[in-house]
Amino acid sequence: MGGLGSPCGGCKFLRRKCVEGCVFAPYFCYEEGSSNFAAIHKVFGASNFSKLISHLPDHDRCDAVRTISYEAHSRLHDPIYGCVSQIFSLQQQVVSLQAQVVLLREEASRRFPQDDPGCNMKQQEKVLAQQMPQDLHNWFHQGILDSDFDPMSGTTRDNERSMDHNESPCSSNESLNYYQEVNFPWSV
């Protein structure tokens, strides 16, 4: 049940009374939870969602809810491909960057032949870094290094909210405040 007698986000969306032991309450808070639940309900259905969650071990449910919510938002944004379009886009970026690495290595081998004893790898990297195309350099430093997105957990580092352990089986770093934790490639 949500805090202080208020329904959880799932029950709020379904306009029903939130009972103790509600399957949605640990994952959908009153404030932001109804919009996340709305996406899940529209794409998968509340009944299918509750059946899926009830068959999972308790320790896997937070990750499953986070994943299902992300997939639902992706499907609403792109009804045909859903999150597959994002995966494909990232794969294309990887292929492009791998091709650039190959080109830079070839250029380095031309500029610094292996038989030159005075040349070391640090010098090669320094010269190549100075000659790296500015747009690639900016993209890498702004998009990857300066990002607060943690790809291992799928969350942002400064926007994790803490939850009372009596309120939810999710630990504080697994809270489901999706708008702050998940960096959707579109505006939510």
Curated annotation (Swiss-Prot):
Pfam families: LOB
Tissues showing expression: Expressed in roots.
InterPro entries in the record: LOB
Compositional bias (Basic and acidic residues): 157-167
Stretches assigned to the LOB domain: 6-108
Species the sequence originates in: Arabidopsis thaliana (Mouse-ear cress)
Region (Disordered): 150-172
Family: Belongs to the LOB domain-containing protein family.
PANTHER family recorded: LOB DOMAIN CONTAINING PROTEIN, LOB DOMAIN-CONTAINING PROTEIN 14
Protein name: LOB domain-containing protein 14
